UniProtKB/Swiss-Prot annotation:
InterPro entries: CbiM, CbiM/NikMN
Residue ranges the record marks as coiled coil: none
Major localization listed first in the record, in broad terms: membrane
Name under which the protein is recorded: Putative cobalt transport protein CbiM
Pfam families xref list: CbiM
Gene (UniProt): cbiM
Role: Part of the energy-coupling factor (ECF) transporter complex CbiMNOQ involved in cobalt import.
Organism: Methanosphaera stadtmanae (strain ATCC 43021 / DSM 3091 / JCM 11832 / MCB-3)
Pathway recorded for this protein: Cofactor biosynthesis; adenosylcobalamin biosynthesis
Length: 224
């Protein structure tokens, strides 16, 4: 999903930077809030960021000027909300652009918008919806990660189609989505399973963390 350096026209790069700014500012405020409220927040923030960095570094080349890979953005969204993931994604994407030549600085706004804002936001909406329907938290985590991953690529396809609407936007969008779908649907399923397994491990070993971060209730965690 990382759009490479210099691939987008400068105007679109600027637009995406501007769109991201208020989300990142709000995310920083949320990080200050959650770290002040709970001592467990900082290590979980680090884990969420590391999870995103590792998964999104496992890239497969794509002919779209982007690439395919897991995203790891649904995991942090469940623990801290999508705004915090936006801030984590900035850190992850800057490191990947500078150290791994994965993505770019000019395209940072576009990549943050897809992987750090809209993808996690959609995944978090799925989490809230499924939990209101009393769906098991582990199953809900699977679908959260699955949707966050896929929506990241839907947004990337939209960004590419807006920049290169040939012969028109909708035709370009169908083309980009079709190319991404071949690799991304299996990757999203695999990411959903991996995220669910890691979540289950945390729930079994440190259920109190999930309670303190208001992810699940004491009854679900089995703690007093």
């Amino acid at each position: 999903m990382h759009i490479m350096e210099g691939f987008l026209p400068p105007l679109w790069c600027l637009i995406y930077y501007i769109i991201c700014i208020p989300f990142i500012v709000y995310g920083i405020m949320q990080i200050r809030k959650v770290t002040a409220e709970s001592d467990e927040a900082m290590p979980m923030l680090a884990l969420s960021g590391a999870f995103m960095f590792i998964l999104s570094s496992l890239k497969m080349p794509s002919v779209t000027g982007s690439c395919s890979h897991p995203c790891g953005n649904g995991f942090g969204a469940v623990f801290f909300g999508p705004a915090v993931v936006g801030v984590l994604s900035v850190i992850v994407l800057v490191f990947q652009a500078v150290i791994l030549a994965h993505g770019g600085i000019t395209t940072l706004g576009a990549n943050v918008l897809s992987m750090g804002i809209i993808g996690p936001l959609c995944g978090y909406a799925v989490w809230l919806g499924l939990r209101k329907l009393n769906v098991n938290d582990e199953i809900a985590m699977f679908f959260t990660a699955f949707v966050a991953d896929l929506m990241t690529y839907v947004v990337t396809a939209i960004e590419l189609s807006l920049a290169f609407p040939k012969p028109d936007f909708f035709t370009a969008l169908v083309t980009f989505l079709g190319i991404f779908a071949v690799t991304q649907i299996p990757l999203a399923i695999a990411e959903g399973i991996l995220t669910m397994v890691i979540y289950r491990f945390i729930k079994q070993q440190k259920p109190d963390i999930l309670v303190k971060l208001r992810v699940i209730s004491k009854e679900e965690a089995g703690v007093n």
